[in-house]
Amino acid sequence: MQTFKKSFLLFSPLFLLLFGCATIQKIGFSQREKLLSAHLKEWENIQIDGIIELNYRGFSFRKNVVLKKMGDRGRIDIFDSGVFGLKPNPFISAYYDSTLFVRLPEQTKFVEINNSSLERELPDLSFIKIFDELVSNKKKILIEKEYRNKDFIFYFSDEMKLEKIELTQENFYVLFDYLKELSKISIFKNSKEIANIQIDKISYKNIKIKSL
């Protein structure tokens, strides 16, 4: 009898774990719909502050970065020093509306990236215009946990958070990692990580993008 009691006490945590896993309820459709709507809403206007590490074609650095998205417009500024330093001038900047403009360290003005070798090296940023399309296709996302068109595939987690964007015509994809909220963005080309952003702060209000 004592042996039975000892065996029961030894295995009871395992029984509880298995029973608990068996009785966990999946998130219902209506709850997932609320989660998806809230998550897509966050991506309408967003500012991300963090540290970017880039290592691509001999171009390597680790610097402060600020990403902003407002509707169909986006901007990224990479700073040579801290954002709140004495001279917080961007080291590299990129602006996207319907066309991509970039200002590199040796340039004083933004240059339109159009039919150039640099354009072929950069991912297609028009995916920032697709979020309205995602909203209008929520039912499809809820069922399949993804949305695709001829250019992109958006993958979503069980919690209805965006976890991957794949560029179907190119060898680029972007991964999104979460703790309580978005904590890291990783960019891959040809299955090799070329950049990642460790996120320090996310804002959803009072976002301003300086036009060119």
Q: Language-model segments: what does each one mean?
A:
Residues M1-C21:
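Sec-dependent bacterial lipoprotein signal peptides
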Residues G20-D72, K208-L212:
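N-terminal leader/targeting segments and the immediate start of mature chains
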Residues E44-I52, F61-L67, D72-I78, I92, ...:
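One face of beta-strands
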Residues N55-S60, S81-K87, K192:
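Solvent-exposed loop/turn segments connecting transmembrane beta-strands
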Residues L67-M70, D97-T99, N114-E121, D158-E159, ...:
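A short, sequence-level motif marking secondary-structure junctions
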Residues R73-K129:
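An acidic-aromatic
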Residues L134-K138:
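Hydrophobic membrane-embedded alpha-helices
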Residues K139-L212:
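Gly/Pro-enriched, hydrophobic low-complexity segments
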